[in-house]
Amino acid sequence: ISAGVFREPINTLTNLGFMIAGLYILYTVSNESSFNDFSGLNKITILYGVTVVYLGPGSMMMHGTNTEWGGWADNLSMVMYIIIPWLYNIYKMSEWSVNTFLKVYISIVIFYAVMRGLFGYGMGIGLDLFGVSIGLWVISEFLYRFWSPSMRFISGFVGFLVLMIFGIFPSEVFENIADYWWIIFFWLPGILAGKKPNGSRTYIWYFAGMTAYIAAWLIWLQGNLTINPDSEFCNPDSLIQAHGIWHILTA
């Protein structure tokens, strides 16, 4: 922890990785021909690239200031990014237009920004929209790959597999259902995905990204003072910060 310009210098500066990644995405799509909704310069690719860039400044505001408003900006940037993949998948499996996709996206972002600002983490209703959106992304990818009328219902149960990866088992969920009421959102993709998507996808980068994210999360746990108070990675003055590594890997 520093008394200088940045309260957490390493954890602040490692956010440059998101900005570099986002700018590279925008550079790449601006130099390629458009062959689907996620190639070439269009409303969706520009939105995606810009939100990746904003992950950097959003997190910088939190780690650089250690303030409540900085935490709000950080959480907002994370939500602005993570809702895009599952909303995009729903767009591809529904009758949504691009403008409908954008209107839904903007509505969710504004709702979260206001509720997070007024009521703090959980928005006063015990909903971690970022965490739930990780599950919705996996669920919607599963449904995209295996879409059928019956899979629209079955896909919701994939959310429990995601929870188990993060150490939360069904027994805990149903014993504390008041805290996990948000599992009902696991069936949201199935409800909205009314048609089989066109085309197919390759998933090598999807699984590579998920692997990097899980590795980053495991490293992040090592630097979490609440979970590992005696860990060498919890030294705030060290140049090697687990949270900084988390930033680099997730970028």
Language-model segments: residues:
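Early transmembrane hairpin module of multi-pass membrane proteins
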Residues: 1-185, 192-205, 211-251
